[in-house]
Amino acid sequence: AELDKALSGTPKPVHDFDFKGNWRCRVLKLGKGLPIVVYPWFSCRAFEDDYSLRLEKTGGSQRTSGYFYDDDDPKRMIYLGALHYGGDARMLYGKDRARDQVAYGYWLSKNRFRLEFPQPEYESLMDVMEFERK
């Protein structure tokens, strides 16, 4: 049921979407040891910095921080980020291959967004990060 909800919705053109702001987010890990692991909701925020649109997961022990880029498909964005842990300094994509994260981002409604991480380095075969606007 949780996975069906996270994967529901029809992607919309991302350039019509304002992702900036505070979100609640959670990760669903699929495959490897267990068929699915659903983590609780944590805080995330998206904002513009001097470089681009940026995402930070600000709660939980496993966090991500990175940037969004345009894709040839108008209904998705590319996310390049890096995994870091609660007490670690934020990392940038490309600094440590084992921590690099790549995902496609999909705008589903005014208050819903999803990142899909194919073949993450740790713990699963695919991660889905679900966002709901606070």
Model-derived features: positions:
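Amphipathic/hydrophobic helical signal segments and adjacent flexible N-terminal regions
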Residues: 1-18
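Edge beta-strand at a domain terminus
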Residues: 2-5, 94-104, 110-134
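Proline-rich intrinsically disordered, low-complexity coils
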Residues: 11-13, 35, 74, 120
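A short, structured loop/turn motif at beta-sheet edges
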Residues: 16-20, 47-50, 68-77, 105-112, ...
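Extracellular structured ligand-interaction cores
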Residues: 20, 41-43, 102, 128
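Central antiparallel beta-sheet cores of small beta-barrel/beta-sandwich binding domains
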Residues: 25-100
